[in-house]
Amino acid sequence: VRLYIASSDDILQGRVTDIYFVRTKEILIKKGLADVRVRMEFHVNGVPRGYEWVVYSGLEDALKVLSQRPVNVYSLPEGTLIPSNYPIPLMVIEGRYVDFVELETAVLGILRHSTSVTTKAARIKRLGMDRKFIFFGLRAAHPVLAPMLDRAAYIGGFDGVSGIMSEEYLGVKPSGTMPHALIVVFGDNVEAWKAFDEVIPEDVPRIALVDTFEDERMEAIKAAKALGKKLFGVRLDTPSSRRGNFREIIMEVRWTLDLLGYKHVKIVASGGINEKSVQQLRDIVDIFGVGTSVAFPQPVDIGGDIVEVNKGGEWVPISKRGKLPGAKKVYRCSTLEYEVVPWNSTPSKCFEDVLELYLQEGRLVKKLPSPQELREYVLSQLKNLPEPTPTD
């Protein structure tokens, strides 16, 4: 019995790779091409239908992988929004190809998965900028991915994450409520709510799950009476098989709580929350718990291609068909307006150079922002954009 996971050493040493990269390295070395230097660019190749922008993330992980090799790495800042219909280089790796060839698999996997999760989180957050969102998606993926998923969702704009390792990795105190299992074990919802209040530290918000045994409205009233002013919120997580009209159920709960003097109690909704349900419920829900739709989003496709080879000390543009040869620099005018020019050219309209040097011969030369700073960076850009049209 074992866990089928790769260790950090496996990843950093290039053992998590595709066999054709290993064979490529062997061929280049044996044929005297080990010293050939290249510039490889990473671009967004495709996005889910309806996506007008993506949020680039996963850079810190990718830099960790590449820092094991003597390469230069240029990149957009992590958390940067880019338009989905314009081929903007996200990252450029410069160095001997044999020094990083087997790392392409890991770098692409990191960037694609993290960018996909962060983009979905940002789309959902943009649909409810004045609402709170907590990431509940760890149970939707292999546990080895938990820190990455929490980080990607958080920097995408989510206000909290449920994973307990988030405090260690992100400096974010984990957020959560209570499971149905707690109430089922007690066999009585009021006893379970009171036990939570008696045992759990006071700084943890009292959010009662109110759809275990009875009608949601009745359980919400019981919770409010049992905990009074200490009750921060009620969570509705009704299974879709029994939900009926979720909006009407929530409105009924809200109306009744207000009528009985419990206007301070927040409404928390979870269970199958996606872009469309956020748009439909954001006027009556204070906090959303979002899981699978963020943990397993439609993918943002990112690819890597050699665009220049150094011959005799000169960089020579070259690429496979369908790709633009030659390394490029990236300049930004505004949130989604960019200008891409050949490496040594001058831009004509955009003058903020956003493709910056992060690794020099494998050594980090630029300070990386904290998760909190990345999140604020993403939110500052989202404020400049119209709401996305929900796609799920």
Indicate residue ranges for each PLM-predicted region.
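Ordered alpha/beta subdomains of enzyme catalytic regions
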Residues: 1-204, 230, 303-392
